[in-house]
Amino acid sequence: MAAFQCPPERVLRPLARAISASQRRRQTYEKWPTGRKSYRAVMCNELGKPLVVEDKFSTENLGTSQVRVAVHSCGINFADILKCIGKYQEKPELPFVPGTEISGEVVEVGSKVTSLSKGDRVLGVCGQGGGMAEECVLPQTALWKIPSSLSFTQAAALAISYGTAYIGLKHKANLQPGQTVLVTAAAGALGLASVDLAANVFGAKVIGASRKEKLVIVQEIGATATIDYTRENIKDKVKELTDGHGANVIMEAVGGDVFKQCLKCIAWNGYIIPVGFASGEIPQIPANILLVKNCSAVGLYWGAHSKHDPQLLRESVDKTLEYFKNGKLKGPYISASFGLDKVNEAFQMILQRKSTGKVVINTKQ
């Protein structure tokens, strides 16, 4: 037998640590009051690499204002994908669980939670991620009760898209009935939400711009006119559709050349609201056009309101739920849903621009 090259206790030390850790986990399980030992979650362990599904241990004790939710669905936002490939402005520390929008059922509440009870159906916003899992813990202020008429899948597609559209159209642009709204990337989740609110709630005329094969759903949601921007010039088409006046409000999510074309067809005293850069090109805004047309370029990042104006953020979701309950909305539109184990396929569907509306991860599939 070969002699040990190092003391046996050093060889056995890692095994001892592993056994000790296993014992600690078992003790945690035994103390867990609801009997829930672990839950499955999507993990980003390395930027740009495939996501994996792993078991995570439940947080044993809730904070006084926290709520534990059994997640049924998690909506995918493009920001989730950008975070996982390292191209988002916010850089989560690795490893992390992606996912911002969730829906599910309350299973436990902290001692000072007054707005929610066990069994409530809710939607929620995970400001720090963590939604692509079977369970998450959120402050009560990040959750909303949902009506029975709203499915969990739909609820996971509501807050960010409709909240952004609401703040942009209502608070940034003060949209009025009869005005013209141009929506780029109109077949995406935010685009369809903007079309839905502008046409069906605020009474505006809506022009939706997207690829030809996706324009049917844009019209079904409420657009009165559409533009295939792979074949048609946005500026010329908008001028034609508005008798030369241009669009009063532009919800712009593409950037690059599309943004430049949009700025050239804005109405006098109009608003252009950049809400994303799907093209990957961040445009420069020529101030001379703003001056001559007396128009405004107003940025909108919905998530920042949680810090700077939480009351408006909450209003944006409250009002959206009210519109849904009153039957004013045609969406949210879901083009596909996947189980946790198919999350990489879901991301690819979005990256390859094969989706319309929202793509959702369902934990119960």
From Swiss-Prot:
GO terms for molecular function: oxidoreductase activity. SUPFAM superfamilies: GroES-like (SSF50129), NAD(P)-binding Rossmann-fold domains (SSF51735). The keyword Metal-binding does not apply. Its EC number is 1.-.-.-. Keywords: Oxidoreductase. Pfam families: ADH_N, ADH_zinc_N. Belongs to the zinc-containing alcohol dehydrogenase family. Quinone oxidoreductase subfamily. This is Quinone oxidoreductase-like protein 2 homolog. It comes from Nematostella vectensis.
